Each structure stands twice: as structure tokens, then as C-alpha cells.
């Protein structure tokens, strides 16, 4: 550290000379030159704060000017806040003795981390699980059936051949709407029938349509009675084949008669 004699007393300001004299009276003879500036800044800040507090106390007491009592009160309040000394040793020993008289919580006897009880730790969960059980609705016994709307059914007649017949092409468009009850409703579903197996004659086949009548019954809320009225085209195909066979038989009989006539 450098000595305070480096700066000439005549070249220093009056406030700096006063601060150097205070340090000399306190027995501080060796210090850096910037210590003077720091002490001056601290003194200026402390004096202005004390005067501001004294002015506030004077205005609160409804005084015209700031007197010495206001300054003493401001210094006392500021000293209690800024310049606090540590408590005496006897006071600290008394507090420590009272604190040590409280026994520590018991350690858990079982294995695991040797921690105090849960109420003294921060390891317990701080949340609760909420169950998501849904209440049964009052309309659980009601059964609803979706509305079924069937569009037009189209089928193209195909010419039968001697081989395996080709099934007719068809397209059915269905739409499912909102769930409704079938009680008191009646509707008809048209279903195309499968074509009869191999037909030996080349007869134009007509596509027959089966009519399925669905009529909800009032027997029970969960029972639906379905009555069907189906017209099959197999009978027509069988009749056509039988007529063709009879025609062939008649032709054979005519040929036999001609042969007998020639023999005669």
C-alpha cells in the first residue's frame, strides 16, 4: 500500500484534506489514494440521506424548518438499519442452547434412505389422482337401430353360353343416417337373385328381383319380425329347359317316323 504523503496537502481539496485528517486521527496512515474518493462519496451519500429523512420527519410533525431533533431521529433510524453490529456472544449461546434442547425426529428402522418422517420431507406426492368413472346414463335400456336407405338396384341381363355363366353386374348404394327406432315403420328392400346355373340354350335371361319386406313387430322392444316374399327365377329357367327338352324329343320322334315311312 502506498503512503498518504504522496499527495501534497496544498494540492488537495478541502474535503479531501478533512477526510485525510479523519483517517490520521483513526490511526490509519497507509492507504491508496482512491480511498479518499470512496470515503468522500460515502459521506456525501450518507449526509444527503440523513437530511432527506429529517425533512420528512419535520413535515410529518408540521414544523416550518428542520431542527436538530429531526436530524438526531433520522441518524438513529438510519444507524439501526445500516450500521448494525452482530449480536453479543452470550445471546447467541443462549439461542443455540434452546435450539439444541429440541430432539431430532427418529430415523426409520426399515431399510432404504435414512430420512426423517414424511411430514418433515419433501418427497411425498403433492397431487391426487381423479377417477374417470362415467355414470350410467338413464337411456341405457333404449336400443336404437340406424336407418337404412337402399338406393336403386340395377342389373344387366347376360346371354347364357354353354360354359360357366358370368354373374350379372350390379351396384347397390346404401346410406346410414342417424339412429332411429324402427317401431311403426315399414320399408321394402329389393335384392337381386343369383342367376341359375349353366343353361344350355341361348335364351335371353331376364333378371328377377326378390322383394324382402321388413315389418317391425310390436312383440317386444328388442325383437324385429322380418317377413320375406321372394320370387325366384329358377322356376322360369327350369320351365324353359323343359320346353327345350320337349322340343328335342318331338324332333327325334319326327325323325323316327320319317325313317319308318322310308322303310315301308
From Swiss-Prot:
GO terms for cellular component: MLL1 complex; pre-snoRNP complex; SAGA complex; transcription factor TFIID complex; transcription factor TFTC complex. InterPro entries: Histone-fold, TFIID-31, TFIID_subunit_9. The keyword Phosphoprotein applies. The modification Phosphothreonine is found at residues 159, 161, 164, 178. Residues 250-264 have a biased composition (Acidic residues). Its main location: nucleus. One of its GO terms (biological process) is protein stabilization. Transmembrane segments: none annotated. It holds the Pfam family TFIID-31kDa. This is Transcription initiation factor TFIID subunit 9. Residues 154-164 have a biased composition (Low complexity). It is found in: Nucleus. The modification Phosphoserine is found at residues 149, 152, 155, 158, 181, 196. Component of the TFIID basal transcription factor complex, composed of TATA-box-binding protein TBP, and a number of TBP-associated factors (TAFs), including TAF1, TAF2, TAF3, TAF4, TAF5, TAF6, TAF7, TAF8, TAF9, TAF10, TAF11, TAF12 and TAF13. Component of the TATA-binding protein-free TAF complex (TFTC), the PCAF histone acetylase complex and the STAGA transcription coactivator-HAT complex. The PCAF complex consists at least of TADA2L/ADA2, SUPT3H/SPT3, TADA3L/ADA3, TAF5L/PAF65-beta, TAF6L/PAF65-alpha, TAF10/TAFII30, TAF12/TAFII20, TAF9/TAFII31 and TRRAP. Belongs to the TAF9 family. It comes from Bos taurus (Bovine). Residues 151-176, 234-264 are annotated as: Disordered. Keywords: Acetylation, Nucleus, Phosphoprotein, Transcription, Transcription regulation. One of its GO terms (molecular function) is C2H2 zinc finger domain binding. The keyword Metal-binding does not apply. The TFIID basal transcription factor complex plays a major role in the initiation of RNA polymerase II (Pol II)-dependent transcription. TFIID recognizes and binds promoters with or without a TATA box via its subunit TBP, a TATA-box-binding protein, and promotes assembly of the pre-initiation complex (PIC). The TFIID complex consists of TBP and TBP-associated factors (TAFs), including TAF1, TAF2, TAF3, TAF4, TAF5, TAF6, TAF7, TAF8, TAF9, TAF10, TAF11, TAF12 and TAF13. The modification N6-acetyllysine is found at residue 5.
